[in-house]
Amino acid sequence: MTSFLKVIILIFMLNCAFTQESNQKIKAAIFDLDGTLLDTQRLYDEANQIVINQYGNGKKYDADLQVKIHGAPPSFGNKYLIDYFEIKLTMDEFMGKKDEYLKEKIPQCKPMEGVKELTHLLKHKYGLKLAIATSAFKNSTDIKLTNHKDWIKEDFDVMITGEDKRIMKGKPSPDIFLVAANDLGVKPEECIIFEDAVNGVQAALNTGATIVVGLPDNYVKNIMKDLPHDEIRTTLCILDSFKDFDYSLLK
């Protein structure tokens, strides 16, 4: 085979690879943090329960109530609990009581099962850009990621946290995901968004993303399935585990 022919074949192969990559409809993946990337949501519920037991009015901190605050900005969730349970603490005092429990638990939090394998494949095999979009503020986010810095540095391009001034409204408004897509340099319809909370999934659906993946607990699974969205424009996938993700959705 002549050198000229080898060059022609190489150019052809490169063009085929470029065409295949450019035709992939999904170019980016955006992940919520608490309860999606990291197993932290249950820790927040435990902290809430401890403070409610000590200072509340006797009402139950049940699953219906948790659905209302999961995924929402912390300022909303904390105020809601203070008002609902008639807790005679300021916002700072309430958060301080929770932090007494969380300060030792949060830095030891683990990734959700199967998520590190997923992000690695999305980034390094499928060539997607990855972002974290969390309602939590940067200082608490950094604490949660204390033992996961190498993973985040290797797989993620962008991180959006709750104090970002471009976020006008918290979840279920789509603002935080739209900011993440913008910073990744992609359109919302070129994104797949992963969430575990009803508020978060509704926010993701409101972006017009092509695919939204919900990973709910059993209690909210049916609620999540019935969330309003444009079924022609957006595919809503409800999974029990990241291990169940179908990579053919990316094509």
Task: Give each language-model segment a name.
Residues 43, 72-73, 110-114, 136, ...:
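Short beta->alpha linker loops
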Residues 123, 128-130, 177:
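Short, conserved structural micro-motifs that define repeat-unit consensus positions
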